[in-house]
Amino acid sequence: MNSQELKKRQENIRNFSIIAHIDHGKSTLADRILEKTETVSSREMQAQLLDSMDLERERGITIKLNAIELNYKAKNGQTYIFHLIDTPGHVDFTYEVSRSLAACEGAVLVVDAAQGIEAQTLANVYLALDNDLEILPVINKIDLPAADPERVRQEIEDVIGLDASEAVLASAKSGIGIEDILEQIVEKVPAPSGDVDQPLQALIFDSVYDAYRGVILQVRVVNGMVKPGDTIQMMSNGKTFDVTEVGIFTPKAIGRNFLATGDVGYIAASIKTVADTRVGDTVTLATNPAAEPLHGYKQMNPMVFAGIYPIESNKYNDLREALEKLQLNDASLQFEPETSQALGFGFRCGFLGLLHMDVIQERLEREFNIDLIMTAPSVVYHVNTTDGDMLEVSNPSEFPDPTKVDSIEEPYVKAQIMVPQEFVGAVMELAQRKRGDFVTMDYIDDNRVNVIYHIPLAEIVFDFFDKLKSSTRGYASFDYEIAEYRRSQLVKMDILLNGDKVDALSFIVHRAFAYERGKLIVEKLKKIIPRQQFEVPIQAAIGQKIVARSDIKALRKNVLAKCYGGDVSRKRKLLEKQKAGKKRMKAIGSVEVPQEAFLSVLSMDDESKK
């Protein structure tokens, strides 16, 4: 194709993504669009086609972004090239959403006709507006008995401020309104800007590792073009690679002769090491490099940290490789090696939130067959020492000596909770119990309320989301962003078994709840840790002060079994001998801590308050 033909082709390209709250029908709508444009034959069609991970299908959520090329013949007789970039809806995967949106010019906003706007819909809309995208509202599930499209149309105008007069009424399940959506994409989403005659600039928005072809980059070409045989260069580190293949996904990978301005596709270039490519980097040609890189993404900082250890210590290197491969595919995962006296060698990992942590753990266990122990999640605390230093601490075992601590600050989040009016009391009670500060409350319509609180992140990472869902019968939707660090009365609590600290069981807790938490955890461990041949004290301590204690009674053999009657001194001698043996055992004996003990620390957070 010459330059003129490529420019003509570029005018007919439309790049868009679909944004929605969880369960508002985003993946189903993507399925219908694939069917309507005949991208996938009816034989290959299956529900949630773009959710390629087993985990995504089982949980019914989208975790990874996916990019697909479709051809659509519009009513005006022209054929358009659509690039549909599927995005996750959950708050933990906002980073994936922001990457998807950077590769688009338009976004289809799907809102459930019965439920209306939810907290995460808002969060994703603001991301789209930040990227200057054209937003097309779609009111989905209009065939539900509880659907009220007019109320939702009004909500879109009032809450988000979008003109919803032309919003498409659709039902992705029944296939109603799909063609109207496609026509609106043609009319309203602008063609990609950019010049095919300029030096190549392509934004890497994702990458996957292939055992045969190395790292495969998913890119959006902003300027210029790339074809097999070219030598590409990474603009962040200057490394060069020879392109072996370029192509598109339909969802299957299909090779092409070139990728030109406006295209979304993949580049394979025999990139062997995972570290050579970074999501958000710009690819250019080594022979004619671009003057400057594209504006990438803001780096996401992990919010929740936990230790991951292999149950079998010889799997340590396998775990490292698995984490490196996951990091390639999930740029927001961070990890570094750490050791624990109780658990051996492992990694300290940083996650965006609890669902993210859960998903990473499941992917490690499923895709790489590694059995893991996870320690209790913690957040990043700012510890101001008496020397005037400020330490960032994410691991309780790294906390300095209490005598050297001047003050501790913890991260607070701005939590936005949308909930039906009748559950406002339950939400406020929960937020207060989690040390939340009330900020404001707005009525979205007659029935739904948007409540905003400042809550410590440490309280949210435990089980806030589960408690919120159960106290509102699943009707609440929740979104949060980091607001600020505030001073708090926090202490580090150590758990001692038989007088020895178990580093993996340490945690940070607010002083007001310290006694309660310590007592609860000691009682719980007493039930879980098996009885030994000697008595084992379990203690919860803050510094040198013991705040709770419970003893596991010793197992004892009946040494008097073979004494039938007889002299009492004989019995006493046997009992004294047993007692001396137990004493010696207690002095040198160590206690095995079962894995359930570590998990129980996670789940024990609020049991006392049920």
UniProtKB/Swiss-Prot annotation:
Top EC group: hydrolase
Described purpose of this protein according to its UniProt entry: Required for accurate and efficient protein synthesis under certain stress conditions. May act as a fidelity factor of the translation reaction, by catalyzing a one-codon backward translocation of tRNAs on improperly translocated ribosomes. Back-translocation proceeds from a post-translocation (POST) complex to a pre-translocation (PRE) complex, thus giving elongation factor G a second chance to translocate the tRNAs correctly. Binds to ribosomes in a GTP-dependent manner.
What is an example of a GO molecular function annotated in this UniProt entry? GTP binding
Chief site of localization? membrane
Give the EC number(s) under which this enzyme is classified: 3.6.5.n1
Q: How does it sit in the membrane?
A: Peripheral membrane protein
State the Gene Ontology BP annotations. positive regulation of translation
Which family does the record claim for this protein?
Belongs to the TRAFAC class translation factor GTPase superfamily. Classic translation factor GTPase family. LepA subfamily.
User: Is the keyword Membrane assigned to this protein?
Assistant: yes
| Positions that bind GTP | D23, H24, G25, K26, S27, T28, N140, K141, I142, D143
Please give the superkingdom of this protein's source.
Answer: Bacteria
Decide whether keyword DNA repair is in the record: no
The entry's protein name is Elongation factor 4
* Entries under Gene3D superfamilies matching the protein: 3.30.70.240, Elongation factor 4, C-terminal domain (3.30.70.2570), Elongation Factor G (Translational Gtpase), domain 3 (3.30.70.870), P-loop containing nucleotide triphosphate hydrolases (3.40.50.300), Translation factors (2.40.30.10)
Residues of the tr-type G domain: 11-193
Q: Write down the chemical reaction(s) this protein catalyses.
A: GTP + H2O = GDP + phosphate + H(+)
